[in-house]
Amino acid sequence: MLLGLHHITALAGDAKATLDHASQVLKLRLVKRTVNFDDPGTYHFYFGDRLGSPGSLVTFFPGFKREAKRGAGQIVSGLDLSQVMLCENDPEPTARLLGILGFTPAGIEGNRHRFELPDGAARVDILHEPQTERGKMGSGAVHHLAFRVADEAEQLEWRARLIEAGVHVSPVKDRLYFHSIYFREPGGVLFEIATDGPGFLIDEPEEALGSSLCLPPWLEPARESIEARLHHDHRIQLLELRS
């Protein structure tokens, strides 16, 4: 069973402005400064509660100059993790996938279709907007939504279940702080199922979370070139980020 939401990841513009907004306006703790493991020239900032607990996490890929265009096939609300909202031209295919994931219908209000996990562990709303054009990714858009599972064994069970249902699912990806599988819902939104562990304390103590640029072991040999690229692309001194 899915335990709820694990995290939500958004695209952002200026890296320093993203850090300031999340910490000062959203009042979130920066628990990890790292990079996008699939694109090490892009920062990946994790914000959450004191320990970065699953379900508290909002993460950002900064550096996107083009602004997003709201539209169908996007998550249009959800940075607070309490009410994730998708915009779809046709809600039925997405509703069927949510059913496979264990969500059940929880009511319709106007063009909003609500789905919930048992005991209210997570809620997803689908806005039915049949005439809305497809959205475009860019700064301000949500990149993907991740659901929680307890461990890798349960994650593999979900992967097999989704494949059996005809869903194209990625292999398991090692994200160091958790393991992930990815798939798209019929409208195009990227979903993820992530494990609760190992967590963010594997490479920094609690009091130092988010204080330095952390890289996974397989990227550590390239640290110098990665830091140089980050500085060049984002125009931010690493010392500024540590302040």
Where are the language model's segments positioned?
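Core segments of cupin and vicinal oxygen chelate
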Residues: 11-53, 86-123, 174, 243
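Conserved donor-binding loop and adjoining core beta-sheet/short helix segment
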Residues: 32-37, 47-71, 77
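Short, structured motif recognition centered on aromatic/hydrophobic residues
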Residues: 5-9, 28, 45, 55-58, ...
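N-terminal beta-strand motif that seeds the catalytic metal site of vicinal oxygen chelate
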Residues: 1-17, 72-95, 138-148, 206-243
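Surface-exposed interaction/gating patches
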Residues: 81-159, 163-169
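C-terminal functional regions that serve as terminal interaction/effector modules
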Residues: 147-175, 179-243
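A short local loop/turn or secondary-structure capping micro-motif enriched for an aromatic residue
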Residues: 65-68, 131-134, 198-202
